[in-house]
UniProtKB/Swiss-Prot annotation:
Pfam families per record: Ribonuclease_P
InterPro entries: Ribosomal_Su5_D2-typ_SF (IPR020568), Ribsml_uS5_D2-typ_fold_subgr (IPR014721), RNase_P (IPR000100), RNase_P_CS (IPR020539)
Reaction equation(s) it catalyzes: Endonucleolytic cleavage of RNA, removing 5'-extranucleotides from tRNA precursor
NCBIfam families on file: rnpA
HAMAP family, per the entry: RNase_P
Disulphide-bridged cysteine pairs: none
Protein name: Ribonuclease P protein component
Encoding gene per record: rnpA
One term of GO molecular function: ribonuclease P activity
Length: 121
């Protein structure tokens, strides 16, 4: 992902933790913070050393980044997302990670509504 789509600084992470809203499932915790002045979304990833060695942690981060790359058009812009991976993610494959991330993002309101338009007229 391009640098402008990343959250890297500790102060930015802390702001999302303090002012953001958290949503979780068994595999991920997602903090979201509205940034209306920002025309794009940004993501920050947190994978604890408890999940495994560096190889496993980096693989999890690659999976999550790839999910966001594929869902780029569906993710609501103008928000910061901090994704924290939990223990079960270490044993999951890419398809399972994507399904779980979709679930928690939908729950957090981080995905655009699908093409369900209802005409009231």
């Amino acid at each position: 992902m391009k640098k402008k789509y990343r959250i890297k600084k500790n102060e930015e992470f802390q702001e999302v933790f303090r002012r953001g809203v958290s949503t979780a499932n068994r595999q991920f915790v997602v903090y979201t913070l509205d940034r209306p002045e920002q025309p794009y979304f940004r993501i920050g990833l947190s994978v604890s050393k408890k999940l495994g060695k560096a190889v496993v942690r980096n693989q999890i981060k690659r999976y999550v980044r790839q999910c966001f790359l594929e869902l780029k058009e569906e993710v609501v812009p103008g928000k910061d997302y901090v994704i924290i991976a939990r223990q079960p993610v270490a044993e999951m494959g890419y398809a399972e990670v994507k399904k779980s991330l979709l679930h928690v993002l939908r729950k957090a309101g981080g995905l655009k509504k699908r093409g369900r338009t209802t005409d009231l007229a």
